[in-house]
Amino acid sequence: MSKIEKLIKVLCPNGIIFKTIGEICETITDYVAAGSFKDLSNNVKYLKEPDYAMLIRTTDIKSNFKGDKFIYINEAAFNYLWRVNLDKESIVLPNIGNCGEVYYLTPNDLPYKRCALATNSILVRSKQVNMKYLKHIFLAKDFQTQLKKIISHSGQTKFNKTDLKKLKIPVPPLEVQEEIVRILDKFGELEAELEAELEARKSQYEFWRDKLFEQNVKEKYIFEDILKSLKTGLNPRKFFKVNTVDAVNYYVTVKELGERNVRYWESKDKINSEGLQRINERSNLEVNDVLFSGTGTIGKVSLIEKEPKNWNVKEGVYILKPKKEKVIPTYLMYLMRSNYMKKLYSDYIVGSPVSSIPMKELKKIKISLPSLQEQERIVNILDKFDKLVNDISEGLPAEIEARRKQYEYYRNKLLSFEELVVNG
């Protein structure tokens, strides 16, 4: 018998009390609780430069505060937003977009001395239950099933505080909560160690990749001279519509360009056969084409390794068709990912707020290109690194995924309780 089973047998043999979120959480609030939209606009000004406090978005938390495009606020705004000051142990639930995600934060996790929660999220705190237990409960299958029932799918997914307060969760004695947290946190620690190792391997991979591309190669080419063509996809406009009744093919955007392959099945938008044909008249997608995001998030790269039968791309995703007598397709993919290439095309990026690199400018870039034999040697080296850091079927990503599934299994098992039935 496990320690948890023994504790339950002694402390609550007849079952676990279930309570609503509203009953156990003293704080269930958000950014807009401070006042009307007009008052918020008057009292809170977003600043690009560091100031008194930082406004924390879920995108910042998700990226582990990497990057430099943070939002800051002055002292008056921070005090105005006192309800969502992140000065204590907190749980953050996105409630507009990304519903179902759960973030546990302490002040030590944050990159700035004073922080407040931004829009589109709910801040939850409880003095009655262990906050880490609450985090695990919110991630568990039973709670997520309840949450799905209160999520609206008109436009962006969303739910409100009022409905959240009504959801029920098991509240075992604190000793049981603490033992559950101890067990589940071990999985989290192991996953964090693996992710840290993966980050180190990625840095190593990027270092050697860039070193290989920055070799002093005498042979120089104008970029368009190593390509058969440089094309792009097509936007709906008057040509076709997305998500029609007969739409069964995937309409791929920059978001679906993966580390190597195109994750076309993740696209939210679909097109019918006529739309697919119209796009392909322009894009002419084929195996060994390299896809490059030339607008918006510039620099995402994928290689087409299987015939693209049921998907095509939007305008802004560039299709690079390599001349195989000049460049190996896989080498071209790695080249487009490299910092060497990014430095070459960054001077030609235009536009704000949506940036892009014009195809005519990309064609003009002068690059160093080794022999096909040397390209093959470089590809073999980088393929090994790529498998280690990006392949979800083997290497570190596969190990991380296995640990995550193990955590989810034990979390759902440990957090499934028999409810105490109170008669009368």
Model segments located where?
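Non-catalytic DNA-recognition/assembly elements of restriction-modification systems
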Residues: V10-D39, K211-N235, E399, K405, ...
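A short glycine-rich beta-alpha junction/loop motif
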Residues: K113-S121, S152-P172, N310-Y318, V350-S371
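Amphipathic alpha-helical segments
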Residues: M1-S2, P13-K19, L134, K165-E206, ...
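Short, structured motif recognition centered on aromatic/hydrophobic residues
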Residues: I16, I21, C25, A53, ...
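Short amphipathic alpha-helical linker/capping segments at the junctions of internal repeats
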Residues: Y112-C115, L198-E214, T244, K309-V313, ...
